[in-house]
Amino acid sequence: MVVSKFVQIRRDLHKIPEIGFKEWKTQRYILDYIGTLSNEHVEVKVWRTGVIVKVKGKNPEKVIGYRADIDGLPITEETGYEFASVHEGMMHACGHDLHTTIGLGLLTAAVTERIDDDLVFLFQPAEEGPGGALPMLESEELKEWKPNIILGLHIAPEYPVGTIATKEGLLFANTSELYVDLKGKGGHAAYPHTANDMIVAASHLVTQLQSVISRNVNPLDSAVITIGKITGGTVQNIIAEKSRLEGTIRTLSVESMSRVKSRIEGIVAGIEASFQCEAIIDYGAMYHQVYNHEALTREFMQFVSEQTDMKVITCTEAMTGEDFGYMLQEIPGFMFWLGVNSEYGLHHAKLKPDEEAIEKAIVFLDQYVKWKGTRK
């Protein structure tokens, strides 16, 4: 079987997933590929483990940006691919290998046939954490080439190949990490009255946090508190002196995020009093909601529907988090879902996107960029 150039690029990238701000091999691969496109109209900057590329237009009046995240996840792959990850315990389980490949494909098309406007490609590290969009946006490297319009995509396993899905306005939720450290008093399991058990305290905290969603958030809004990890204790017959909860908060409104955090802090204070312990809350990284520019999104959806072979679906907002939201705070633009028809979902060890989606995306995005690049 002969695979296309860009399918092979995706497979190469899939083998070398790297976590946030450690994407050195991925960066090197991107730079090496760009080197094969050697062209007097192409300029390249390196920012940390990311890459920023500018393709100079023939008669530029604006700058159109395309953002692709490049990092992987700390997940042990179970796809059975011949080109599976060679980095133990790491995987491209969120499709960033496809995002990057599509970006390189669009870049190739832009170099081959230049448009009037400048194009800037942002190969961004650390979307999965601790967050690369905001520091890249604030960097001196990008300020000089800051786009006037920006777009990004995310693969969607639930949609068939040949479809995109998006909407005007709110697309993805506000997100925040949540870490709570509890410290009490350890002791012998036979003498619980002499200790303050942090396993019990953590258990109470987990259940009480769920009341925030059902009783403190407007039912017409949406919010999620998920505790994904609890650690504490050493052996079975010692009462745990410490425990730690790790989770995530998702809300569709900024106001709800503030309300949820306020209630979490109140509940944690109650746990401190009830169990005579100390508690520290850390919200870690927080991502701003992805809010699509209404007019640009409407124009994009109409163009794709009327002038390409892709099917357009108007979707509902999702509780997914994306640091691309920070870019959309500063730059008008939009994000959309790209259908890849996978039985398994995002962040799953068996995620297998249909590679046919890669070239379809490159083709229709090239059509859109060329069209947009001729409009004033």
UniProtKB/Swiss-Prot annotation:
Pathway the protein contributes to: Amino-acid biosynthesis; L-lysine biosynthesis via DAP pathway; LL-2,6-diaminopimelate from (S)-tetrahydrodipicolinate (acetylase route): step 3/3
Pfam families referenced in this protein's UniProt entry, alphabetically: M20_dimer, Peptidase_M20
Active-site residues from the entry: D69, E128 (proton acceptor)
Record's keyword terms, sorted: Amino-acid biosynthesis, Diaminopimelate biosynthesis, Hydrolase, Lysine biosynthesis
Recorded catalytic activity of this chain's protein: N-acetyl-(2S,6S)-2,6-diaminopimelate + H2O = (2S,6S)-2,6-diaminopimelate + acetate
EC numbers for this chain: 3.5.1.47
Enzyme class: hydrolase
Gene3D superfamilies (alphabetical): 3.30.70.360, Zn peptidases (3.40.630.10)
Entry's Gene Ontology molecular function annotations: N-acetyldiaminopimelate deacetylase activity
SUPFAM superfamilies assigned: Bacterial exopeptidase dimerisation domain, Zn-dependent exopeptidases
Any GO BP annotation: diaminopimelate biosynthetic process
Task of the protein: Catalyzes the conversion of N-acetyl-diaminopimelate to diaminopimelate and acetate.
Family: Belongs to the peptidase M20A family. N-acetyldiaminopimelate deacetylase subfamily.
NCBIfam families tied to this protein: amidohydrolases
Name of the protein this chain belongs to: N-acetyldiaminopimelate deacetylase
Organism: Bacillus cereus (strain Q1)
